[in-house]
Curated annotation (Swiss-Prot):
Intracellular or extracellular location(s): Secreted; Nematocyst
Disulfide bonds: C2-C36, C11-C29, C18-C33
Site (Buried residue in the protein structure. This inaccessibility may explain the lack of activity against ion channels): F24
TM region(s), chain numbering: none
Domain ShKT: 2-36
Tissue expression remark: Predominantly expressed in mesenterial filaments (at protein level), a morphological structure that has a functional role in prey killing and digestion. Also expressed in club-tips, tentacles, actinopharynx, body column, mesenterial filaments and pedal disk.
Broad class of the protein's primary localization: secreted
Lineage: Eukaryota, Metazoa, Cnidaria, Anthozoa, Hexacorallia
Entry protein name: Kappa-isophellitoxin-Tst1a
Species this protein is from: Telmatactis stephensoni
Amino acid sequence: ACENNFSDRECERRKKDCDSSMKFRELSCPKTCGTC
């Protein structure tokens, strides 16, 4: 189960990481913030 446990600011930061980092994408929950 995936849940968004991040603030909006953290979510935006993670979204940028998802867009630029395949490693981040692989290690993170795909549904985090609905961005990965």
